[in-house]
Amino acid sequence: MKNVKEKQFEELVKQYKRTIYSVCYMFSRDKEEINDLFQEILVRLWLGFDQFEQRSSVNTWVYRIALNTAINSDKRAKRRPQTVPLSTDIDPYDPQDSSLEQVRQLYALINQLDVMDRGLVLLWLEGIGYDEIAAIMGITVANVGIKLHRIKEKLVQKSKSVTH
């Protein structure tokens, strides 16, 4: 029989599963890596579940743990030697559909950003407000706006260099 804590945690996971997968997908396209990262985030959430003091919203807490875990995982992966996968994933986008191709190109450009900028863009794309982004990322609200503006400029420049 499950205790109260386990039931509460299951509800939290049900409610924030999409959010966690969004973070995972922003940091990897490999299905196995995404699942590994998802599991690692769940472990971190479980370990921190008792310590959550509700000084911020649950949404902010989940995003912060998910992003920090993804960023740390990304840093560890960069220190590992590169390997060549045995199989390649099939691109789910139809190359005939130009709007999907544009989205794919945008995500490819976003993935070229450093991990902190990627995290910031992810939160913004998820529709999170500047106040909550600031709380999650540990920066000021003004800095969120400045960073997003600079990231957008960077993405525009990168997209121009790709199309020319």
Tell where the protein language model's regions lie, with residue ranges.
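Internal acidic/polar
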Residues: 79-106, 129-130
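Sigma70-family region 2
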Residues: 2, 40-57, 76-77
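Hydrophobic positions on the alpha-helical face of helix-turn-helix-like DNA-binding modules
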Residues: 41, 65, 120-121, 133-134, ...
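A short, charge-rich alpha-helical start-of-domain segment used by transcription regulators
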Residues: 1-22, 35
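Arg/Lys-rich amphipathic alpha helix in sigma70-family domain 2
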Residues: 51-53, 64-84, 99
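Short amphipathic alpha helix immediately N-terminal
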Residues: 112-132, 136
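Structural recognition of an alpha-helix C-terminal capping motif at a helix-to-coil junction
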Residues: 22, 36-43, 56-68
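DNA-recognition helix of helix-turn-helix
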Residues: 71, 137-162
